[in-house]
Amino acid sequence: MENRLRESTIINKRYVFDLKVTPYFKHKKMCEIQTSDIRAWQNELIKKGYAPTYLKSINNQLAALFNYAVRYYDLRDNPCRKAGSIGKSKADEMDFWTKQEFKEFLPSMDSKPEARMAFLLLYWTGMRIGELLALTYEDIDLEKRCITINKSYQRLNGKDMITPPKTPKSNRKISIPPFLVEELKEYCSMLYGI
């Protein structure tokens, strides 16, 4: 199964099991875990105040493990199925800055040119933070007014890594408005003396 998943996905799944699942069920074999145990575990997670989408993700990972054991190791049934799910699969709609809110915020970054440029790029292009952190000068075409997104930054096991995008659709070219081209020229000139 591991060869089908990205390294970051494997690390995240291990993290969830090591911190959220194993400590609670470490004294029981899978075949000893009952629906009531799952419900008690779910209630403990809910008390911790995790986001509904995170609760759903944790619950789904344990349910998937039980499904795997039912399918391939003759476990009689999946207690997660009987216990039902927790959380929700869709996050609440994101709250974006209005243009006015962004204009009011931006001057607070005037003494921090790197942060100012980062916020400008994030706001006006919609790129993800990992995509921004992986950008190189070669990804920016000031003449054609576009930025090529073809990689992402991640921190895996304490190491900085540049990885391919999560999906093929994440590879894209983003058009940038003329004023942002001018901001980028000024910023690159400051950095590289160009």
Task: Label the model's feature ranges.
Residues M1-R76, A91:
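N-terminal core-binding DNA-recognition domain of tyrosine site-specific recombinases/integrases
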Residues S85, A134-G193:
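Conserved tyrosine-mediated DNA breakage-rejoining catalytic core shared by Y-recombinases
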Residues I33, W97, S175-I176:
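A conserved hydrophobic position in a structured secondary element of the catalytic/binding core
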Residues K28, S36, N78-R81, D95, ...:
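Extracytoplasmic/periplasmic beta-strand context in beta-sandwich domains
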Residues P52, K56-I58, R71, L75-L135, ...:
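Basic, Lys/Arg- and aromatic-enriched nucleic-acid-binding interface segment
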Residues N3, K47, R71, S111, ...:
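Secondary-structure boundary motif
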Residues Y15-L19, A40, N60, A64, ...:
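Generic recognition of well-ordered alpha-helical segments
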